[in-house]
Curated annotation (Swiss-Prot):
Entry protein name: Translation initiation factor IF-1
Similarity comment: Belongs to the IF-1 family.
Compartment(s) where it occurs, according to its Swiss-Prot or TrEMBL record: Cytoplasm
Protein species of origin: Borreliella burgdorferi (strain ATCC 35210 / DSM 4680 / CIP 102532 / B31) (Borrelia burgdorferi)
Complexes and interactors: Component of the 30S ribosomal translation pre-initiation complex which assembles on the 30S ribosome in the order IF-2 and IF-3, IF-1 and N-formylmethionyl-tRNA(fMet); mRNA recruitment can occur at any time during PIC assembly.
One Gene Ontology molecular-function label: rRNA binding
Protein purpose: One of the essential components for the initiation of protein synthesis. Stabilizes the binding of IF-2 and IF-3 on the 30S subunit to which N-formylmethionyl-tRNA(fMet) subsequently binds. Helps modulate mRNA selection, yielding the 30S pre-initiation complex (PIC). Upon addition of the 50S ribosomal subunit IF-1, IF-2 and IF-3 are released leaving the mature 70S translation initiation complex.
InterPro entries: NA-bd_OB-fold (IPR012340), RNA-binding_domain_S1_IF1 (IPR006196), S1_domain (IPR003029), TIF_IF1 (IPR004368)
Amino acid sequence: MNIKEEAIETEGIVKESLPNTMFRVELKNKHIVLAHLSGKMRKHFIKIVPGDKVKVELSPYDLTKGRIVYREK
């Protein structure tokens, strides 16, 4: 099985911007996770600011960390 297939994808709202493209994201179920920006978003200079609605991929092994893969318009 591919790691990408195992990832849990959910939506959330960015609450805080941290150094090194890290963000605190509040998920729909009110959990707070620490998320970093995906490589493609860094490459294309997609900016994320607090208040943005984003899609986050979580690993089933550590549900406190994730990767931001999409920013809603």
